Amino acid sequence: MKANELREKSAEELNTELLNLLREQFNLRMQASSGQLQQTHLLKQVRRNVARVKTLLTEKAGA
């Protein structure tokens, strides 16, 4: 997910996206802890996407 794509979304859409990412992160962490996760790079990608969305929400709140 690109930051430019996220910048076009409204704050409500970003909150929805954040909720989806946090759910996905939880599921990936559960899979990793049980040894079922084959693609461990997804944890890093989702964590960074969460950070991107939170950053944009903070920017929009300040603007």
UniProtKB/Swiss-Prot annotation:
<keyword id="KW-0689">Ribosomal protein</keyword>
<keyword id="KW-0687">Ribonucleoprotein</keyword>
<dbReference type="GO" id="GO:0003735">
    <property type="term" value="F:structural constituent of ribosome"/>
</dbReference>
<comment type="similarity">
    <text>Belongs to the universal ribosomal protein uL29 family.</text>
</comment>
<dbReference type="GO" id="GO:0022625">
    <property type="term" value="C:cytosolic large ribosomal subunit"/>
</dbReference>
<dbReference type="Pfam" id="PF00831">
    <property type="entry name" value="Ribosomal_L29"/>
</dbReference>
<dbReference type="InterPro" id="IPR001854">
    <property type="entry name" value="Ribosomal_uL29"/>
</dbReference>
<protein>
    <recommendedName>
        <fullName>Large ribosomal subunit protein uL29</fullName>
    </recommendedName>
</protein>
<dbReference type="GO" id="GO:0006412">
    <property type="term" value="P:translation"/>
</dbReference>
<dbReference type="InterPro" id="IPR018254">
    <property type="entry name" value="Ribosomal_uL29_CS"/>
</dbReference>
<dbReference type="InterPro" id="IPR050063">
    <property type="entry name" value="Ribosomal_protein_uL29"/>
</dbReference>
<dbReference type="InterPro" id="IPR036049">
    <property type="entry name" value="Ribosomal_uL29_sf"/>
</dbReference>
